[in-house]
Amino acid sequence: MILIEEMKIYILNTTRFYHEDFEEYPGAWFSCPVDFEEIRERLGVQSEEEIEIEDYELPFPLEGNTRLWEINALCRMVQEMQGTPLYYEMDVVQKRWFSSFTEFIDHKDQIRYYPVQDGEALARYLVQEVQLFGEVHPDLLNHIDYAAIGRELETSENYLFTDNGIFYYR
């Protein structure tokens, strides 16, 4: 996992041509979110059309034509999630339910998190805390087969079991 402090992109100045004295085109690493004024100052460019993203270290993939404002928006959304269970499991969650990182970001508020480790604990939590079956009389709580309910939940596509807890999305 890439930490927030480590999110960065390598940007090339495409207006300066390759020269034998240089090993490559002039470029530099920039921390994200990126400030275009810093790019302008360090690379000597005037517009975004004069740059190209050559490399990146981000918790999401970039397409060839991703604009800086899009990268900045995604980085800010990742920063907003920092410290949450979803932040630590975003790669697994995204791959489970979404075809792209942008789609994951668009639906992240619809993902529920349960701070338990297995199906039986999740069943107990859903019955007793969330009141999945409505209010159950306390005398009946000990007669519920939480293990069986948990096994059903574990086979559901709507739940994702991770080391950091369980996520639900429908």
Predicted feature descriptions by range:
Residues 5-6, 123-170:
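Acidic, proline/glycine-rich low-complexity IDRs
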Residues 36, 119-120, 146:
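Alpha-helix initiation and N-capping motif
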Residues 1-49:
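N-terminal ordered "arm"
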Residues 88, 92-132, 169-170:
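Extracytoplasmic/secretory-pathway segments with low complexity and glycosylation-like composition
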